[in-house]
């Protein structure tokens, strides 16, 4: 992935996916593929996407999040966005996507 890194930690009933780097048209399809594969194979019921290290996301990134949310629901899992920077939070609010995602301030709250 172009300057995008994923670290996955499974704890208790959830899997925490820490994303580092920007989510944009250059890397969103690879991010989508990796998350879809993970969601379909993990036994954890909660998937928490820790976005604390993501400062930029474009429309391709938003589309990827929507696809992952749908995949999670199909697989009987809860998909949670966590630790959003103000710039990402603002984009989600402007597009009204904050209404369809569960969003927490911290990973621990998820």
Swiss-Prot record:
This is Putative anti-sigma factor antagonist TM_1442. It comes from the Bacteria. Residues 4-110 form the STAS domain. In the phosphorylated form it could act as an anti-anti-sigma factor that counteracts an anti-sigma factor and thus releases a sigma factor from inhibition. The modification Phosphoserine is found at residue 59. Belongs to the anti-sigma-factor antagonist family. PANTHER family: ANTI-SIGMA FACTOR ANTAGONIST TM_1081-RELATED, ANTI-SIGMA FACTOR ANTAGONIST TM_1081-RELATED-RELATED. GO terms for molecular function: anti-sigma factor antagonist activity. It comes from Thermotoga maritima (strain ATCC 43589 / DSM 3109 / JCM 10099 / NBRC 100826 / MSB8). SUPFAM superfamilies: SpoIIaa-like. Signal peptide: none annotated. Phosphorylated on a serine residue. It holds the Pfam family STAS. InterPro entries: Anti-sigma_ant, STAS_dom, STAS_dom_sf. CDD domains: STAS_anti-anti-sigma_factors (cd07043). The lineage of its organism: Bacteria, Thermotogati, Thermotogota, Thermotogae, Thermotogales. Keywords: Phosphoprotein.
